[in-house]
């Protein structure tokens, strides 16, 4: 079954702050609506309102038919202790809740509770529609299709980030929702996973509302865009795909700026003319008094009439100013203005691997020979679990090979953002840890730099472990700006960054002149960043290639 969702004059936010208001749109079967906006604009808040998890500050959300099976798949940064893959799939597909409801109504039916027969019939119908009846049979094949071979009894806490991403994708593929709400579904997916997700979303007959910072995914999948513009305190709905939205938004912003500039120029001109007329009027009165000391009545009358004409012109100008249609000045958006500080040049050869191999459990990486020279800009791609992070650790000297040799050059100043965002002590307040990491800055300078990256006083006082992944990433970028580096290592840097920050990162990378190792599944980032070579890692082997 499919469903239609209607948001009317919706307002959302927190008790003391409204993030958006007057938002109206309809999600019909087959629609794929992308929600975009800066971090903190209320994207996840909107999904929670559409899911019925939170109560809106204003407006309504309704579905047709009533009781439609709406699936809300939020980001989950923490895993539940003791939860198996099987239990995770049941929970994320809604099958666990449907089973619990059916068992509860069956118990009421058995005890003869009034109305239990109707409640049980509805619960049983929902249980069947959710796919709970055969989920256990369908799950292994779907997991295998995604290259996942571990048994479903495996604990989720035992999985790597890439494995968790594949299980999360499997939950989506196994779901049978009437309408789907997805919050950052592309995070941690490799290229194969992204393509499978795109295929699934594009083939759905149900409506989809999704939040994503993956520009290529948005361009390939969405049919409409809902923009939450925090800077302008506006909401807008754009028909068409993501690239069409970018063009329309650019035109709308240009027109808004032109309209304001025209209004401001016209108002300034009228104000200037009114001021001039007022000065002329005052000067005329003074001149008349000087020329007519004898108070000749006729001359005095003529002077007064002239002054009155000037005053009338002033009033006309002031009236024209009041009649102007006020045009609000477009607010300037917060811009990161991110720069990567440069260190003195390193040795000509930055890092070398010579027939390097390393084995961890059943996984063997290598043998690999590779070299990074000063100023090289290398993009590294490959499936999750292929060995990309292992390659980085060997190049940086974080891992010692079992065989072969790994050499790091002299005067290499490394700036690194790894997938774990582990650049600061987890048990230290962000502000304190940042100050320790950049001793050359005084505390005020360090806090100012954090604020520049959108990390305000309350975040600086929070423990690093309590920060969101996006906040951790911005803290890592702030460190790169504070320290001088000549070897920049970025492992999935766009995960958890919003679109404006991703664009700022691209600009910073364009002006950075040191060596760069960029691991990413972000296809637009790979296309937009200037690279000299691309290395592809798969099954522990590295294929070196020149970027075309």
Model-derived regions: residue spans:
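ABC ATP-binding cassette signature C-motif
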Residues: 1-258, 341-548
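Flexible nucleotide-interacting loop at or near the entrance of a catalytic core
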Residues: 108, 115-141, 257-364
């Amino acid at each position: 079954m499919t469903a239609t969702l209607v948001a009317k004059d919706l307002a959302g936010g927190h008790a003391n702050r409204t993030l958006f208001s007057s938002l109206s749109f309809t999600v019909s079967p087959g629609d794929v609506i992308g929600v975009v906006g800066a971090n903190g604009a209320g994207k996840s808040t909107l999904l929670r309102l559409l899911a019925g998890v939170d109560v809106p500050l204003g407006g309504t959300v309704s579905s047709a038919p009533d009781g439609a099976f709406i699936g809300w798949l939020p980001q989950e940064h923490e895993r539940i202790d003791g939860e198996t893959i099987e239990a995770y799939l049941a929970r994320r597909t809604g099958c666990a809740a449907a089973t619990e409801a059916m068992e509860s109504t069956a118990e009421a039916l058995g005890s003869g509770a009034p109305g239990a027969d109707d409640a049980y019939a509805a619960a049983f119908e929902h249980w069947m529609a959710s796919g709970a009846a055969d989920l256990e049979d369908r799950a292994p094949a779907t997991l295998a299709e995604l290259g996942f071979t571990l048994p479903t009894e495996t604990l989720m806490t035992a999985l790597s980030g890439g494995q968790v991403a594949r299980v999360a994708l499997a939950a989506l593929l196994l779901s049978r929702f009437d309408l789907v709400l997805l919050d950052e579904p592309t995070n941690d997916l490799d290229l194969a996973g992204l393509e499978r997700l795109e295929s699934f979303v594009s083939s759905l007959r149900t409506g989809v509302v999704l939040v994503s910072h993956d520009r290529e995914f948005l361009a390939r999948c969405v049919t409409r865009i809902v923009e939450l513009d925090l800077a302008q305190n506006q909401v807008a709905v754009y028909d068409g795909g993501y690239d069409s939205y970018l063009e329309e938004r650019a035109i709308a912003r240009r027109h808004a700026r032109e309209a304001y500039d025209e209004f401001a120029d016209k108002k300034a001109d009228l104000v200037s003319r009114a001021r001039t007329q007022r000065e002329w009027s005052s000067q005329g009165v003074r001149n008349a008094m000087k020329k007519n000391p004898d108070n000749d009545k006729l001359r005095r009358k003529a002077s007064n009439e002239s002054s009155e004409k000037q005053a009338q012109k002033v009033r006309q100008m002031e009236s024209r100013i009041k009649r102007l249609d006020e045009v609000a000045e477009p607010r300037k958006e917060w811009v990161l203005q991110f720069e990567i500080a440069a260190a003195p040049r390193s040795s000509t050869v930055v890092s070398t691997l010579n027939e390097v191999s390393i084995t961890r459990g059943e996984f063997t990486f290598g043998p690999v020979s590779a070299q990074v020279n000063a100023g090289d800009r290398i993009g590294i791609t490959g499936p999750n679990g292929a060995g990309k992070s292992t390659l980085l650790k060997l190049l940086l000297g974080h891992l010692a090979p079992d065989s072969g040799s790994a050499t790091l050059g002299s005067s290499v100043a490394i700036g690194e953002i790894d997938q774990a965002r582990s650049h600061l002590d987890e048990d230290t307040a962000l502000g304190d840890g940042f100050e320790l990491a950049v001793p050359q800055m005084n505390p005020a300078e360090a806090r100012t730099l954090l604020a520049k990256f959108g990390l305000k006083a309350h975040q600086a006082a929070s423990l690093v472990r309590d920060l969101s992944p996006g906040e951790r990433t911005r803290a890592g970028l702030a460190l790169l700006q504070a320290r001088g580096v000549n070897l920049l290592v970025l492992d999935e840097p766009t995960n958890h960054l919003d679109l404006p920050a991703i664009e700022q990162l691209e600009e910073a990378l364009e002006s950075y002149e040191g060596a760069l190792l960029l691991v990413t599944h972000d296809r637009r980032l790979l296309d937009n960043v200037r690279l000299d070579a691309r290395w592809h890692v798969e099954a522990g082997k590295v294929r070196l290639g020149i970027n075309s």
